[in-house]
């Protein structure tokens, strides 16, 4: 199982750099609800109905995982390590889900490779 960051799902959806890799593992991925909101925000910003986009994500093999209190604590604990890299709350939410599930995090953000975490960053 891999945990998708919003950037990875957007790369897949918009056929950006790295989309072929995401396509090859998409059936073995989950994504946090915070990151789904980021993806839907992109659709909304571009004039598309975010609800329609959500229904397509929901119908895909990707499991949407709710953001929990455990994830909130993990994400907050990552602030000191991630602030200097410019990582957002959404980034930390993805990392928190990845840590809680002990699964690799799949992102298009190269800054994540500088992190020293107990998970693999792809």
Language-model features, listed with the residues they occupy:
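Active-site neighborhoods of divalent-metal-dependent phosphate/nucleic-acid chemistry enzymes
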Residues: 65-106
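Alpha-helix capping/helix-boundary segments
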Residues: 8-9, 35, 71, 93-94, ...
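Short, well-structured N-terminal submotif of metal-dependent ribonuclease cores
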Residues: 1-31, 43-55
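Active-site regions of enzymes building and remodeling cell-envelope glycoconjugates
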Residues: 28-29, 62, 116-122
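Histidine- and aromatic-rich ligand-binding microenvironments
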Residues: 2-5, 31-33, 87-89, 107-110
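Short secondary-structure capping/turn micro-motifs that flank functional sites
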Residues: 59-60, 73, 113-115
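Short loop/helix-cap segments at secondary-structure boundaries that form the rim of catalytic
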Residues: 21-24, 111-118
């Amino acid at each position: 199982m891999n945990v998708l960051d919003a950037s990875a799902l957007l790369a897949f959806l918009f056929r950006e750099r790295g989309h072929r890799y995401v396509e090859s593992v998409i059936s073995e991925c989950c994504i946090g609800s915070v990151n789904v909101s980021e993806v839907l925000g992109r659709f909304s910003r571009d004039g598309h109905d975010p609800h329609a986009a959500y229904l397509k994500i929901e119908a895909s093999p990707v499991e949407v995982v709710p953001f929990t209190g455990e994830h909130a604590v993990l994400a907050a604990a990552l602030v000191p390590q991630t602030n200097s890299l410019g990582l957002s709350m959404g980034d930390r939410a993805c990392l928190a889900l990845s840590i809680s599930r002990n699964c690799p995090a799949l992102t298009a953000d190269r800054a994540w490779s500088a992190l020293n975490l107990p998970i693999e960053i792809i």
